[in-house]
């Protein structure tokens, strides 16, 4: 069970990281925001906060158990990826039909900035906690990220971005629950 959870955790972080970095660009571009260069802003916020999250994970791992950090990071990165995917222009127009399109576009831009930054922070925390688990998990993480990147670049017409982003968020949430369960069982047995 532990090996499966570690494998799924590595897959989840790799999928989340690559989905946000590589797939969100085309997803936002397809969401009627062609005139806005939101991806550059999202990545400009995502990357530094990812680095801060990784640094926080390293610093906090001395005071807080790595398993708790991993669960915390996975839980919130999953929530923010799902929210980032759901709150696009089309969904916001359905939720608020009386708002002007310009206002909705502006709202989506702010949502993408905030959610991109928060997602980067929590994926960074998860990444820092996972890399300490061993070289195999780091290699798996990189392989999943590379695989999603290849899918996004070489077969863009065949892939719908929304299911991949929802899968990344859902897998992060599932791994957070599995890691939480393992942590609870470990404390019960002690």
Per-region residue spans from a language model:
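A membrane-interface helix-boundary motif in multi-pass transporters
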Residues: 152-170
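Residue-level signature of mid-helix packing/kink "hotspots" within the transmembrane helices
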Residues: 47-55, 121, 145-149
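Multi-pass alpha-helical transporter architecture, strongest
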Residues: 170-190
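Helix-to-loop junctions at the C-terminal end of transmembrane segments
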Residues: 53-66, 156
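Transmembrane alpha-helical segments of major facilitator superfamily
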Residues: 41-50, 141-144, 171
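Hydrophobic core of transmembrane alpha-helices in multi-pass small-molecule transporters
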Residues: 95-124
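C-terminal ends and interior cores of transmembrane alpha-helices
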Residues: 75-101
